A protein has these predicted regions:
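Helix-centric, low-specificity signal for extended rod-like, repetitive segments
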Residues: 1-2, 150
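Bacterial N-terminal signal peptides that target proteins for export
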Residues: 2-12
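Bacterial N-terminal signal peptides
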Residues: 12-22
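Subset of outer-membrane beta-barrel
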Residues: 25-326
């Protein structure tokens, strides 16, 4: 009974976050898998990574960041979302182009009518296929003549969703850009890797529900602006102002180019979510973990693995493991 109560709270949370569509016969609204903060390193910083570059997780946050990613990179992640639901992500990127797939499954939830009596067992499933690209001076040579480091990106999203016996699908398009600035020296220290980003989300697109698309709901255009900078060549600060007024603050400290420690806060209205994370970089193989707290639900634990084949060095990785393992 306690588990069913928790799952009903999860569905209530899904219904409250974003009005993605009105489900026929249910009269509720559900969120999209795209509204859950993706990735693992990004989640550890509460999603304040929209201006970071050269990372396969740029696929999820700002495709323009893919422009500086060379070679082949693979990423995968899994989380027990809110302690009950399953959230899984996969991504692959090659020389600025990327494909991704996100899956959310609430599990079985006991449905109830207006009087509170049990009706049927329902489940909410939502998947999204992503195709993204990032173009910078490596791909567009004329950008090298600009006084700033400019890159542009785009993303095509295909979404499928089902709630009980009702299903739907749709697509949307995003465009984004990033600008990097020269280092700034202030007294005895310098600020490096200063970047700003802007993602224009869901420029057009809609979800269609029912056998004959009786119900249609547009995604609704929104913006996500971001800023990040590095201090002392090891400490990264990130700030994102996201859709529906969300504020993301994050920090990452890297020790010996091996261990990354992350923390962040996400604010929406008067609701605050806190995150922490840790990452281990083993010469091309990254292992990441993130924890996200929730006010009335169990914490989300997410783990992921990223492989950068261009940096993969099994010999160096073996040496690192020998130093850190007993």
């Amino acid at each position: 009974m306690k588990g069913n109560s928790k799952k009903r709270r999860i569905v209530a949370l899904l219904c409250a976050v974003v009005a993605a569509t009105a489900i026929a016969g249910v009269g509720q609204s559900v969120t999209s898998v795209l509204e859950i903060e993706p990735g693992v390193a990004g989640l550890g910083m509460a999603g304040a990574v929209g201006s970071r570059t050269g990372d396969v997780e740029s696929l999820y946050y700002n495709p323009a960041g893919l422009a500086s990613l060379e070679g082949l990179s693979l990423t995968s992640s899994y989380s027990s979302q809110w302690g009950e639901s399953n959230y899984t992500g996969f991504g692959v990127a090659f020389n600025g182009w990327a494909l991704g797939y996100l899956m959310f499954n609430s599990g079985d939830v006991e449905g109830r009518d207006d009087t509170g009596s049990p009706t049927e067992t329902l489940s909410y499933k939502n998947n999204a296929a992503l195709f993204a690209f990032g173009l910078g001076e490596n791909q567009l040579g004329f950008l090298a003549s600009l006084p700033v480091d400019l890159s542009i990106g785009g993303r095509l999203k295909f979404v499928t969703t089902s709630f009980g016996e009702t299903s739907g699908s749709g697509m949307a398009v995003d465009l984004s850009t990033q600008i990097g600035f020269n280092p700034v020296r202030l007294g005895g220290f310098s600020i490096t890797d200063m970047r700003v980003g802007l993602a224009m989300l869901d420029l057009f697109g809609r979800l269609n529900y029912g056998e004959n698309d009786e119900y249609t709901e547009p995604f609704g255009m929104d913006l996500r602006a971001s800023f990040s900078a590095m201090l002392f060549d090891a400490l990264v600060f990130g700030f994102d102002f996201g859709p529906v007024g969300t504020i993301h603050l994050g920090v990452e400290y890297t020790l010996l180019d091996l261990l990354a420690i992350r923390a962040g806060m996400l604010s929406l209205a008067d609701v605050f979510t806190f995150t922490i994370g840790i990452g281990l970089d083993l010469q091309g193989i990254g292992i990441d973990y993130a924890l996200e707290t929730h006010n009335n639900l169990s914490a989300t634990h997410r783990i992921g693995v990223t492989i950068d084949l261009g940096r993969l060095n099994l010999g160096s990785m073996s040496g690192i493991l020998q130093r850190i393992l007993p």
